[in-house]
């Protein structure tokens, strides 16, 4: 049995795909197949029942209008504006009005006194299957992550482990105020693994983008995984789970890094079923290969693609992203910690691109978005100050806290293809809303609402979370979650995974 950090280092990229393989030749969302139900049943059985089956406490009455009353409202919509004190009316899961003194006698009232009311955070890139491996690599580099998380653990994941990881990650996101999350899911060792991930997202109640990716293998050669159906199984997923884009969980394709010969067939598979694309690029020295120039030569770059990290892209590649209408996701905490390169915040801005933000891996970084905002806010300011100290007479402007908050909300919605539905508190949009307490010692007395959110708050300030008008968290507690069962689910999944991977779990 090996210790956790005994795994051999690897030269693969973060997606486990540096080698070039041969070219690859509705609203009723929870309509899972009998096979997927059988696959997942063991999870509920071993946990003493499903972790989410409990009479909700703090939930509102289904179908009844909700009036969020008397909060400091940050709509982040220029037409709507912000209000020192105002109300938000929700009808049919959508925002119907944002203004002071709304009268709605039949609505259920949520008192927002001493709270900031704002759009929920939007995460554009998180490997949610790793939710049962939190904190496993606090000191790890990118190479350590590949060797330990992907090769050692990922290759041994069962469908039950995938379910547990995704479910934990989704609940953690909701708890910290993230109302929409892109699951960059590269754990599809079999179709049963895929069904498990989809079911977990649906069961969690999160608004999610399921980005279907490759398998994990002990040698990193995912394209040789015998049980995997990637990327062609995306056609089944579209038909079985994602026949409509107007549902709580929607479909993307997570394209692997590597050569154009590897990537192009996955792009084609996505576009054949009308799915958007997300891909890691510009990661460390491995990212200095001019990949986007090569893909552009094949006319593969379009506005349907989100580019993650982008730390070591060249100027031409940045121009290609801008000119083709692509979006960018920056995971500043991970990028500085694991050796991806400097987070390209200023580079994106200089290129005319407003980035979105993402957590990336909970194996090494915290899952809350407040940390992500503060990381990029401080790094951009540090870069500007460094230029000034070096004698730059025309340095960039400092980011404002409002811009950072927009990166965490509407720009995330844009990258996830959902900016028409979420990201601001505009009447007609879905009611993805969070209420943040200002009567806590880390922020009171509150003097600047946007500044408080970006520079002072944390998950402990998240009082209430609504997704599509449904209350998911209230009074600081998740609604309808049995935590005793949840603890058992996590412990059993973790212990099973360590055993299957032949790794000794050393917790100190």
Task: Please report, for each region that a protein language model flagged, where it lies by residue.
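Active-site gating loops and adjacent loop-to-helix segments of metal-dependent hydrolytic enzymes
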Residues: 132-162, 217-231, 285-304, 324-327, ...
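N-terminal secretory signal peptides
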Residues: 1-25
